[in-house]
């Protein structure tokens, strides 16, 4: 009986981590910070690299599924569909170009400073301060004039600039979606397309992070077992779909104000519990 209760608690833990990852990966509040802080507050173990890789995969699958027509829409190059085809190819190139900065920065840190994130940058104090900084950056973005850049008319320099800011998401507490959406708004993107491009840009970025986690914890996958990881994967996939759909609809008529307030409150709560 005790064994059954223990297994149930393990499944609930994986379910909880999946929910947190799915919702906070796309809502601009930082999934890494929430996974770390909530695990500390609830007194449960850090999710670990193997579970992190699995739930990140769930987020990637959710993006790919939600935007499958944008990603996999390789139609024939008939004259009627030529413009759509060319726009599709340019979007894929833009995503690759926007991924370059985070690959360079993340790869350099992994190679030359492998224990970079095992220090003060992962502390609760650091996460709280980063949350305040992100709230200010998001405030600047929300206060900027509405732009006219979108998925169809953007250029490669636009995507590289957003990718440059995305690279800072390797620091715990930043929020990949938060910094990419905010930088897009500041540089003149329309709200809805800023969020959409941010999510699409997350496919290679989150995938690379999952691959790194997978390689570093390959043996742990067998120790955790298939079914607990599957629970985390499915939970993340479903909650990610809900988060993406919510945010795209929310951004059609709203700004970042509610998330700015949340990030300030989140930072204060962390400081009060140091």
UniProtKB/Swiss-Prot annotation:
It comes from the Bacteria. Keywords: Antibiotic resistance, Cell inner membrane, Cell membrane, Cell shape, Cell wall biogenesis/degradation, Hydrolase, Membrane, Peptidoglycan synthesis, Transmembrane, Transmembrane helix. It catalyses: di-trans,octa-cis-undecaprenyl diphosphate + H2O = di-trans,octa-cis-undecaprenyl phosphate + phosphate + H(+). GO terms for cellular component: plasma membrane. Disulfide bonds: none annotated. GO terms for biological process: cell wall organization; peptidoglycan biosynthetic process; regulation of cell shape; response to antibiotic. It is a multi-pass membrane protein. Its main location: membrane. The keyword Transport does not apply. Its EC number is 3.6.1.27. GO terms for molecular function: undecaprenyl-diphosphatase activity. It is found in: Cell inner membrane. PANTHER family: UNDECAPRENYL-DIPHOSPHATASE (PTHR30622:SF4). Belongs to the UppP family. Bacitracin is thought to be involved in the inhibition of peptidoglycan synthesis by sequestering undecaprenyl diphosphate, thereby reducing the pool of lipid carrier available. Catalyzes the dephosphorylation of undecaprenyl diphosphate (UPP). Confers resistance to bacitracin. This is Undecaprenyl-diphosphatase. It comes from Prochlorococcus marinus (strain AS9601).
């Amino acid at each position: 009986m005790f064994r059954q209760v223990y297994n149930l608690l393990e499944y609930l833990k994986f379910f909880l981590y999946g929910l947190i990852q799915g919702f906070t990966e796309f809502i601009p509040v930082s999934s890494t910070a929430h996974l770390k802080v909530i695990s500390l507050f609830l007194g449960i173990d850090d999710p670990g690299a193997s579970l992190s890789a699995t739930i990140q995969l769930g987020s990637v699958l959710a993006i790919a599924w939600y935007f499958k027509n944008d990603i996999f829409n390789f139609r024939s190059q008939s004259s009627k569909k030529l413009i759509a085809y060319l726009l599709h190819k340019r979007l894929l190139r833009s995503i690759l170009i926007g991924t370059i900065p985070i690959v360079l920065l993340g790869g350099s840190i992994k190679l030359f400073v492998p224990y970079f994130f095992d220090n003060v940058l992962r502390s609760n104090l650091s996460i709280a301060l980063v949350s305040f900084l992100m709230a200010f950056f998001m405030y600047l973005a929300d206060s900027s004039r509405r732009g006219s850049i979108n998925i169809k008319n953007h250029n490669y320099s636009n995507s590289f600039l957003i990718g440059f800011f995305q690279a800072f998401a390797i620091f715990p507490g930043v929020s990949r979606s938060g910094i990419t959406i905010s930088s897009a708004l500041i540089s003149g993107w329309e709200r809805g397309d800023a969020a959409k491009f941010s999510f699409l840009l997350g496919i290679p970025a989150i995938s690379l992070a999952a691959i790194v986690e997978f390689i570093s914890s390959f043996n742990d996958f067998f120790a955790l077992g298939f079914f607990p990881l599957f629970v985390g994967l499915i939970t993340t996939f479903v909650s990610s779909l809900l988060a993406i759909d919510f945010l795209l609809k929310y951004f059609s008529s709203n700004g970042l104000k509610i998330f700015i307030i949340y990030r300030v409150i989140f930072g204060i709560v962390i400081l009060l519990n140091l």
